[in-house]
Amino acid sequence: MVLAASVAQEVANVPFAHEVAGLVQPVAEAQNVLGLIPMSHGLILAGILFAIGLCGVMVRRNFLFMLMSLEIMMNAAALAFVVAGSRWVDPDGQIMFIFILTLAAAEAAIGLAILLRFYHQRGHLDVDSANEMKG
């Protein structure tokens, strides 16, 4: 207890200590604002986005729309990680978001390359004729 009091006294004696204390206040206010939005709202939004993406993958037969729906699903999962990470004030959610964002970019690049190849071969983007592709 004495150590904590001496550290607090030393911090108070540091020049510009009031400016450092002024920088801490906006961070605390930002964390309070995050507490105003319930976690359930963010997770419900992520679930709705995931369901929309899943319906798009299952219903649409166009390869481009299926790729876009898959991106929506990945963004919904990333949103769920960010919401959960902000709820528990843990940076792991944001780290997973960056990982998912990188994975989505790689998936989009490979998917678009396959899409272009498929379109040049077939002249359309209907996925039902994909089983006729040859090596």
Swiss-Prot record:
Protein topology in the membrane: Multi-pass membrane protein
Keyword Transport: yes
Class in the EC hierarchy, top level: translocase
GO biological process: ATP synthesis coupled electron transport
Keywords for the protein's UniProt record, in alphabetical order: Cell inner membrane, Cell membrane, Membrane, NAD, Quinone, Translocase, Transmembrane, Transmembrane helix, Transport, Ubiquinone
Signal peptide: none
One Pfam family per UniProt: Oxidored_q2
Compartment list: Cell inner membrane
Listed EC numbers: 7.1.1.-
Gene Ontology annotations for the cellular component aspect, listed alphabetically: NADH dehydrogenase complex; plasma membrane
GO molecular function: NADH:ubiquinone reductase (non-electrogenic) activity; quinone binding
Parts of the chain that traverse the membrane: 33-53, 63-83, 95-115
Top-level taxon in the UniProt lineage: Bacteria
Catalytic activities: a quinone + NADH + 5 H(+)(in) = a quinol + NAD(+) + 4 H(+)(out)
PANTHER family (alphabetical): NADH-UBIQUINONE OXIDOREDUCTASE CHAIN 4L, NADH-UBIQUINONE OXIDOREDUCTASE SUBUNIT ND4L
Subunit structure: NDH-1 is composed of 14 different subunits. Subunits NuoA, H, J, K, L, M, N constitute the membrane sector of the complex.
Role description: NDH-1 shuttles electrons from NADH, via FMN and iron-sulfur (Fe-S) centers, to quinones in the respiratory chain. The immediate electron acceptor for the enzyme in this species is believed to be ubiquinone. Couples the redox reaction to proton translocation (for every two electrons transferred, four hydrogen ions are translocated across the cytoplasmic membrane), and thus conserves the redox energy in a proton gradient.
Family per record: Belongs to the complex I subunit 4L family.
Protein name per UniProt: NADH-quinone oxidoreductase subunit K
